[in-house]
Amino acid sequence: MKLAVDTHTHTYASGHAYSTLIENARAAKQNGLTLFCTTDHAESMPGAPHYWFFSNQRILPRFLEGVGVIRGVEANILNTQGEIDLHPSVDHNLDWVIGSFHEPVFHPADKAAHTQALIETIKGGRVDALGHLGNPHFDFDFEQVIACAKAHNVAIEINNSTLKGHSRVGSIDRCYEIARVAKSLDAYITTGSDAHFCLDIGGLSLASQLIDEVGINPQRVITHTARQFLDFLELRGRQPIEEFAGLL
């Protein structure tokens, strides 16, 4: 499946990534993306940027190198109450919020705790997608969580970096099963490279392969076209982004 949007990318501001936003935009252009989301880690991750970094994203231009820039964050799920490490005052300056588990922030517990945390995060209404869910350290009830995500219009991320097999080892089979459950429940799917270096921006071939093999309806893959992604943001209650009105 052709994918026009990469919804999970990092700059060197994350503390363990190595490229600038301009470098990422150039790579996005070279790789044929229409839009990309810049989603540095929120402040609870070691080395992550300060609150102001996210609050000030309103100054970012809507296009860099001819590619649309979606202002975002990868927030950390903090606890079983579904709290995330992003002050609510930042929300109106961002277009896209991923909620993810990371071991340095949320210590792996048990399946019930992870399931509760994900469900409460969804119900909290502040995240647009759940990131890299395949991690076996954070097992959860696939059916319960994805059904809740479907009910609240929260997308399930297929993470290309995970599918390489080098990070979150043991995730690949789980990613395929998560995708199959998402297909059966007609949930929304998003795709992210999780790039920590510019040459990986738009690298979504393994995510695309998974989508094709599982047979997910392109209409449920919000990154299939820029318009599908922008329509999803509006479905989530975001205001239309005027500069992107002409994107297809």
Curated annotation (Swiss-Prot):
Binding site for Zn(2+) 2: 16, 41, 196
Superkingdom: Bacteria
Cofactor: Zn(2+)
Binding sites annotated in the UniProt record for Zn(2+) 1: 8, 10, 74, 194
Cofactor note: Binds 3 Zn(2+) ions per subunit.
InterPro entries the UniProt entry points to: Phosphatase_YcdX_put (IPR023710), PHP_dom (IPR004013), PHP_phosphatase (IPR050243), Pol/His_phosphatase_N (IPR003141), Pol/histidinol_Pase-like (IPR016195)
UniProt key word Zinc: yes
One of the GO BP terms on file: bacterial-type flagellum-dependent swarming motility
UniProt-listed Pfam families: PHP
Protein family according to the UniProt entry: Belongs to the PHP family.
NCBIfam families in alphabetical order: PRK09248.1 (NF006702)
Protein name (Swiss-Prot/TrEMBL): Probable phosphatase VC_A0894
